């Protein structure tokens, strides 16, 4: 696998109960390929396969590793060396928490600690694991103490910290819906925008049969001074607003854009908005619900 062709690779590891599963879920929602508990010795084979067959489907690969894997400590260093020879330099995220917090989490979930049993009680198992993983902690690019984090806190921190490591996580998906007010407002919209103030090509006999997908309609609606001013301010508003929703942990937002019939003004505006948001690295879907009715 050539270095230029490799997917970004992260290894999420650390103390049991510190939040590894939560972090893996966060990355999965962000369109990373995630896998937990994979034997260390087969990681290189997995990455070769993904680089060959899944380059366009995922933003990267996130591997969850911990002491439950029988070969973890013995093969961890060797696996890193093999990856580096392949041109892959994995980033390591190490999760930890104070012992009281970990003990409380295990007591709450009533799940046994992986090292608990025999002469080791829960508190001793937590400390023993901390000592065993000290060399792994030393290799980490990012150490997160999750003692005071809620699940939502952890999600926000993961996004922020990963960006500081050189990654880019534009997590919010924007769903655009166009509609005609005379057919009803979409019930699944988070926000509704009424564009009936814009010039209406419906009353131009040469334009009436066209739709907002046609250049003539787009020029009529957004090419005039009123349309240009509106669209610039509308886009600026959304580019300010959407990151605020991202910061609150939202995964998606649905914007409904309406005009009288849902064929001209709303469609042309939504088409332009989709293109503009994609240039800002948002994942955008677009549905014209009433374009054939208006």
Swiss-Prot record:
The keyword ATP-binding applies. Gene3D superfamilies: P-loop containing nucleotide triphosphate hydrolases (3.40.50.300). GO terms for molecular function: ATP binding; GTP binding. The keyword Transmembrane helix does not apply. It holds the Pfam family RapZ-like_N. GTP binds at residues 66-69. Keywords: ATP-binding, GTP-binding, Nucleotide-binding. ATP binds at residues 14-21. HAMAP family: RapZ_like (MF_00636). Displays ATPase and GTPase activities. Belongs to the RapZ-like family. This is Nucleotide-binding protein Dde_1774. It comes from Oleidesulfovibrio alaskensis (strain ATCC BAA-1058 / DSM 17464 / G20) (Desulfovibrio alaskensis).
